[in-house]
């Protein structure tokens, strides 16, 4: 009989929720105030997810353009969690702003109302981004992650679909907090979170005592896909194959070292499919089409994010201090008025 896995604790912001009143994190006790959806006129459907349908809408009281996320029937507890987290994070750097919580007067279906972002589909956008653009948007995403982590919240579904970018205005927002959760040390969490290509190794080996560092793996996957122009970077056919794809890059020996450190027992199915793989050098992924996006600093940052051992990954704040972002920090420390001009000028010059 396998023994229990070893414990683990976040390297940063571990006690944030224990230092706050219970009201802050006890989302099950939260009672959202539901307004009337009649204030909002749906204009067009923007998309649908597993848990919701999303529409562009107009607030008829002030003519403001908004996004309305109509929630599909799920447990009340899940809706309360999303609302509580969005309320706690309201006003946070690059976090999508929750404007209102409403219900359809007839069906009583709950809906969340958000600020509108003129998003460019990432599949098109990522093809035209310059080296500087990638640094800029990754830095903006790190601001959002450091903010939510500092508030005791893991996003748990970081991926391109959940990062809205208005490229004209150079505006980024982290959206879809439906899988987000409060971090409490030693709590065991559901591993059925995040989307396959962005799932950290901890999820794929069923290690439940994970933390904010899960989001840093997902961000690393996004960075890899952007600089190498390979979307997604780890392209597994299922959750088992996903770990195999990771092992083919990071190596199997290193994986076994991780499992040993945390006393993790691997699902026997992996014995048939893992094989033996040596660790690959990041330089192996450079080719003529992506060379202009890759630099030694980019590879160094990537290497410090895509680590099996979640405790070894850079935190959001540490990542922001990495030399890869020096050009962005330098630009953002210029007088404000010049920023947008400077940024577009740099983009045009490349």
Curated annotation (Swiss-Prot):
Modified residues (N6-acetyllysine): 97
Top-level class of the enzyme under EC nomenclature: transferase
EC number per UniProt: 2.7.11.1
PROSITE patterns with a match to the protein in the record: PROTEIN_KINASE_ATP (PS00107), PROTEIN_KINASE_DOM (PS50011), PROTEIN_KINASE_ST (PS00108)
Pfam families, A to Z: Pkinase (PF00069)
Record's keyword annotation contains Cell cycle: yes
Any one Gene Ontology cellular component term annotated for this protein: nucleus
Any single GO BP term: apoptotic process
Description of activity control: Constitutively active protein kinase whose activity is not directly affected by phosphorylation. Seems to be regulated by level of expression and localization.
Keyword annotations from UniProtKB, A to Z: Acetylation, Apoptosis, ATP-binding, Cell cycle, Cytoplasm, Kinase, Nucleotide-binding, Nucleus, Phosphoprotein, Serine/threonine-protein kinase, Transcription, Transcription regulation, Transferase, Wnt signaling pathway
Places the protein is found: Nucleus; Cytoplasm
Record-listed ATP binding positions: 46-54, 69
Domain spans labelled Protein kinase: 40-325
Recorded catalytic activity of this chain's protein: L-seryl-[protein] + ATP = O-phospho-L-seryl-[protein] + ADP + H(+); L-threonyl-[protein] + ATP = O-phospho-L-threonyl-[protein] + ADP + H(+)
Active site: 157 (proton acceptor)
Phosphotyrosine: modified positions: 13
Modified sites of kind Phosphoserine: 18, 21, 288
Main location class: nucleus
Top-level taxonomic group: Eukaryota
GO molecular function: ATP binding; protein serine kinase activity; protein serine/threonine kinase activity
Assembly: Heterotetramer composed of two catalytic subunits (alpha chain and/or alpha' chain) and two regulatory subunits (beta chains). The tetramer can exist as a combination of 2 alpha/2 beta, 2 alpha'/2 beta or 1 alpha/1 alpha'/2 beta subunits. Also part of a CK2-SPT16-SSRP1 complex composed of SSRP1, SUPT16H, CSNK2A1, CSNK2A2 and CSNK2B, which forms following UV irradiation. Interacts with CSNK2A2IP (via C-terminus). Interacts with SIRT6; preventing CSNK2A2 localization to the nucleus. Interacts with RNPS1. Interacts with HIRIP3.
Similarity remark: Belongs to the protein kinase superfamily. Ser/Thr protein kinase family. CK2 subfamily.
Additional facts recorded: Can use both ATP and GTP as phosphoryl donors. Phosphorylation by casein kinase 2 has been estimated to represent up to one quarter of the eukaryotic phosphoproteome.
Chain's role: Catalytic subunit of a constitutively active serine/threonine-protein kinase complex that phosphorylates a large number of substrates containing acidic residues C-terminal to the phosphorylated serine or threonine. Regulates numerous cellular processes, such as cell cycle progression, apoptosis and transcription, as well as viral infection. May act as a regulatory node which integrates and coordinates numerous signals leading to an appropriate cellular response.
UniProt-recorded name of the protein: Casein kinase II subunit alpha'
Source organism: Homo sapiens (Human)
Gene: CSNK2A2
